Amino acid sequence: MLICSTFHEMSATWLDSALEAVTLDEVVEKVKERAGFRPGYGDKAREVVDAYAKAFPGRKPAEIWALATSTRQSVVALADQKSKQPAPVYVAWFGWQPPLFDGRMRAFHCVDICFWFANTDLMLSHTGGGARPRRLSEKMSRSLLQFMKNGDPNGGGLPAWPRYTPANGETMVLDDVSEVRNDPDREARKALPPL
């Protein structure tokens, strides 16, 4: 299994530019009641937001909001369960951001799909088109083909991609310069309520 999610799955800022100015305190209030498609974090909201701010220093509060309400917790839970079976699991986390809407779109929900299928030049509203997204797309689509042929994405142009294990949380972070990182948000996810 190859599983991918994006950094900013449920980012609200691309629809409302005023939300770019949100503060961390305002993010806490927003995630008390609602966290993406899930119920809010209630009394844990401050702990969750602080954990993500610590794990991702230098990120704007709007980005912390998106990271803390993304689907990554579910992706990791699925990978943990699937890794108990004999077939390998590979996990990716898409962080590439299009140069559109003054950067507000970020790595939004499903933007990675056109990269996997070599369609970045057809999805100008998602990527802006051109050489920059195409370079990553070529590597991602070749890696997906390798995975479809062999059950292993290696050999497609991305860095060496180890199988996912719950102990290390090996995750291919997809961006202009892709790299494998061991469970890059593990400490932050510990603050989240259980699924």
Positions of predicted regions on the chain:
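Mature extracytoplasmic/periplasmic domains
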Residues: 79, 154-181
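Tryptophan-centered motif/residue detector
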Residues: 96, 144, 158-161, 192
